[in-house]
Amino acid sequence: EVKLVESGGGLVQPGGSLRLSCATSGFTFSDFYMEWVRQPPGKRLEWIAASRNKGNKYTTEYSASVKGRFIVSRDTSQSILYLQMNALRAEDTAIYYCARNYYGSTWYFDVWGAGTTVTVSS
């Protein structure tokens, strides 16, 4: 069974940091692009970051809203995807999901975790 399980969310003050984790199982983690997507309260899903395999190395990509503040990485030995979030703002409040990108360069995210909630508030 393919599973993604996010953790690490919580309440943090503006300017603070959090690290989210996405533990994966049931597939060859290193073979897939992995994505982070969030949903702010009352708003649509927003793609924010990706870790993508290009040959034998991984590249990262970010949305303009988080670039320079968030860092996506992966531990292939433990099949875990991470999202280090720095300089957090109130507008980063959201449910954060990791997703597997099945087709690679397209926007077909076939497996999602249940999400972890991040609240940025003083």
Curated annotation (Swiss-Prot):
GO terms for cellular component: extracellular region; immunoglobulin complex. Keywords: Adaptive immunity, Immunity, Immunoglobulin. GO terms for molecular function: antigen binding. The record marks Y33, R52 as: H-bond with the phosphate group of phosphorylcholine. It comes from the Eukaryota. Residues 1-121 form the Ig-like domain. This chain was isolated from a myeloma protein that binds phosphorylcholine. This is Ig heavy chain V region M603. It comes from Mus musculus.
